[in-house]
């Protein structure tokens, strides 16, 4: 449903060292805004804006690991061309935008019109950074988290002056339930073993 104003969620978390086995005391604040709206005959759009900050010095898994996706199944809140735990930040801001053109394009093609396919497009942009103090925690050879996480995943930080960006496009409403999308990574193309192109699918059941 179209939302005339964004739905805003503000979340604060405090961790207590020693409580339920916790190793750190920390504070985290996360802000999220979500809205759907129509663009007249152009179709409908939705966006999710998210920002987070922690002043605490913590190992990477307790900061803000950005959600990557290495599968072929589309996950709406994930970055489709980002690897698992490829980037982590202690402060970040992101926007994820999706647009459904509805019948604007395919309804002009007689045979395709009967199938009721819908052309979709999306774009994700993420800005973030990580303080050097948090980098050093994961470099500590005495850290119990080092062998468990650091050797398996990158946990790198983003350049605060260079966003992570990706775009996608595809077809929705195939057989009324299937969506197929292609995604292109636009930045950090030489970072590790990047996923420059991904083809993904998802299934949506409506009752």
Q: Which sequence ranges carry the predicted segments?
A:
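Exposed, low-structure sequence patches enriched in small/polar residues
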Residues: 1-207
């Amino acid at each position: 449903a179209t939302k005339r104003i964004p739905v805003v969620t503000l979340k604060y978390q405090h961790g207590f060292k020693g409580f339920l086995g916790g190793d750190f005391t920390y504070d985290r604040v996360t802000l999220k805004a979500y809205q759907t709206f129509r663009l007249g005959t152009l179709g409908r759009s939705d966006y999710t804006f998210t920002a987070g900050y922690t002043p605490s010095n913590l190992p990477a898994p307790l900061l803000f690991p950005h959600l990557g996706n290495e599968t072929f199944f589309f996950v709406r809140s994930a970055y489709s061309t980002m690897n698992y735990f490829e980037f982590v930040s202690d402060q970040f801001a992101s926007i994820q935008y999706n647009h459904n053109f509805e019948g604007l394009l395919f309804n002009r093609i007689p045979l395709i019109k009967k199938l009721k396919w819908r052309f979709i497009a999306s774009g994700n942009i993420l800005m973030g950074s990580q303080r050097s103090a948090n980098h050093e925690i994961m470099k500590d050879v005495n850290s119990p988290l080092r062998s468990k996480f650091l050797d398996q995943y990158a946990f790198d930080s983003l350049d605060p002056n260079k966003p992570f960006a990706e775009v996608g496009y595809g077809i929705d409403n195939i057989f009324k339930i299937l969506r197929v999308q292609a995604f292109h990574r636009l930045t950090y193309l030489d970072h590790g073993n990047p996923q420059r192109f991904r083809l993904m699918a998802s299934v949506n059941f409506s009752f």
